[in-house]
Regions:
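Structural transition elements
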Residues: 8, 340-371, 387-390
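Alpha-helical secondary-structure segments
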Residues: 61, 136-143, 173-177, 222, ...
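Gly/Pro-rich hinge or "lid" segments in bacterial periplasmic/extracellular proteins
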Residues: 81, 192-248, 542
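Surface-exposed binding/hinge segments that line
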Residues: 111, 158-204
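Ligand-site clamp/hinge motif
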Residues: 240-283
Length: 543
């Protein structure tokens, strides 16, 4: 496992903003170098002096990312990044993704045996649940057992229907030893980031997915939930004054509805937002703004429902649809050139595990016509409302397909509804936009190409490939870096040959913020989505 992580991290660029500063009624901060990505080694920004003020910022306001992402507990939250982030404000895990590797969190110390099978975690002895009950190793043990019967949203305790944990031993009130069923490179993340729940609450709950007790949002995290409105997607969190770990940077975190994030940012209504490609130059030149690059972190896929449209079970038809799409034009029109045509093997070209040895599907409308015109396909095209760019991309897809004889009807829904329709298979083709493209690929490959239809919003209806499923399933057990690269190369080749889904374009995107207002943003090693990293909400984490 150590070799696997080391290889990935050595090839990835990690951006971390280590100094934390800001302004509120009690103090001021100094901006980082404006118009550029923040310097990972910078410590020039003024940090909050605990003697002068308790928090870097009184209220940190962020966009709600387009809607409701579920209640922030392990059984109610959306598995998209914004949903998981809100849950992780409230419910802590043993470990946390740090800038370079996993770091201690609820566990004060931890170790792994040389054979990668035995994990020992010793908890912070002063950790408390939000109702002031102590957190103990028995809560960790209970969480493992409870999730075995009631899987948490996005949980990874099971691989191919078998638990990754063989057994555990609680050796004292604050120490648990977990024995893995087999050595997997993914065990550290899957075990370490499991949200821990309080035994004294959930042991009396038979149906956690519908439980509505007043204590359903009691965790031991850095923040407590103050309010949540599913109708507007609004959330407010308050700093946990009894928190055992890092110092919360904001007194309150508010997620607010926004119709236009750029306008909201300009008006000072939110502290951070992505910047569209057409506005990048203007904002990068401003002295009061810092930019964070997120290279190929986000991208679009076109999902194909082969059960609803049996003609698409023919790979020649799928290839024709792919060739009908002018993806270079999509990069130019949607991302103003700040992006890439996605690989048919899914893994983007900026990912260290990318393989160029995949089937290429260049734009060829005439070849597509020969296959598609005789079929007379009529497709119901479901899209979301993630970003204004999505409507633009959908229109380009529609135009390209209609130019080769495919009739397309576009239906637009809010993000949660679109995701629900993806899970249930309520579409012919569906456009989805998500992050995680540039992380180590195994998690996304498992979700997209080895999942079960009806259980995940990522999976293709009407497609299965046992060889690919077996290959992806073997990847977590590979610790040799050369063998790992070979396995990823083979998986990408199979995916590009089968093209059960059509990766379209990936985005070289940027987030922007005002360092003088809030400068605590951090990157986790497996993602450049700064707003989704727990460390971004602490004022005392040092890189």
């Amino acid at each position: 496992m150590k070799k696997t992580i080391a290889m990935f991290l050595a090839l990835c660029m990690i951006f971390a903003l280590c100094a934390c500063g800001g302004t509120d009624q009690q103090g001021t901060g100094q901006p980082a170098s404006a118009g550029t990505a923040a310097d990972p080694s910078s410590t020039d920004a003024v940090t909050a002096d605990p003697a002068e003020r308790e928090y870097v910022i009184e209220v940190l306001r962020l966009s709600n990312d387009g809607g409701d992402f579920g209640g922030p507990n392990p059984f109610r939250h959306s598995t998209r990044g914004p949903g998981s982030t809100k849950m992780r404000h409230v419910f802590d895990s043993l470990l946390q993704e740090g800038p370079d590797n996993y770091i201690p969190w609820l566990a004060e110390t931890w170790s792994i045996s040389d054979d990668n099978l035995v994990y020992t975690f010793t908890l912070h002895k002063d950790a408390l649940w939000h109702d002031s009950e102590p957190v103990t190793a028995n809560d960790v043990a209970f969480s493992i057992d409870y999730y075995a019967k009631n899987p948490n949203n996005g949980g990874n305790l099971f691989t191919a229907d078998s638990s990754i944990i063989d057994h555990y031993e609680v050796t004292d009130d604050y120490t648990i030893v977990i024995y893995a069923a087999r050595a997997l490179s993914t065990n550290t993340g899957n075990i370490g980031t499991l949200p821990i729940i309080p035994k004294h609450i959930w042991e009396n709950v038979d149906d956690p997915y519908n439980y509505d007790g007043d204590d359903k949002y009691i965790g031991c995290g850095m923040y407590k939930l103050v309010s949540y409105d599913s109708a507007t997607g609004s959330y407010q969190f308050e700093a946990n004054e009894s928190y055992y770990g890092h110092k919360p940077a904001a007194h309150y975190i508010d997620y607010v509805p926004t119709s236009d994030n750029i306008l909201a940012f300009e008006n000072g209504d939110i502290a951070m937002t992505d910047v569209s490609a057409d506005l990048y130059d203007a904002y990068a030149a401003r002295d009061d703004i810092a930019m964070i690059p997120k290279n190929d972190e986000m991208g679009y896929r076109l999902m194909l429902n082969m059960d609803k449209v049996p003609a698409m079970q023919d790979v020649e038809v799928r290839a024709a649809i792919y060739k009908a799409l002018d993806r270079n034009k999509m990069v130019d029109s949607v991302f103003q050139g700040l992006g890439h045509v996605a690989s048919a093997g899914y893994v983007p070209q900026t990912n260290p595990f990318y393989s160029d040895d995949v089937v290429k599907y260049d734009y060829d409308a005439e070849a597509a016509k020969e296959v598609l015109v005789p079929l007379g396909l009529k497709l119901r095209f479901v899209i979301g409302q993630d970003t204004p760019a999505e409507a633009t991309l959908a229109e380009l897809v529609k135009m390209d397909l209609e130019a080769v004889g495919v009739e397309v009807t576009v239906e637009s829904y809010d993000v949660p509804t679109r995701d629900s329709m993806a899970t249930s298979g309520d579409y012919d083709i569906l456009l989805t936009y998500h992050g995680g493209w540039n992380a180590e690929p195994v998690s996304m490959l498992s979700a997209i190409y080895a999942g079960t239809p009806g259980k995940s919003k990522w999976v293709t209806y009407g497609y299965s490939n046992d060889e690919l499923v077996s290959l992806i399933g073997s990847i977590p057990g590979i610790f040799d870096s050369s063998e790992l690269k070979d396995a990823y190369n083979k998986a990408q080749l199979i995916i590009s040959e089968d093209i059960p889904q059509l990766p379209l374009i990936t985005q070289v995107s940027y987030a922007m913020y005002r360092p003088a207002e809030y400068n605590c943003w951090q990157a986790c090693f497996n993602s450049t989505q700064f707003a989704n990293c727990r460390l971004s909400y602490t004022s005392d984490f040092e890189f």
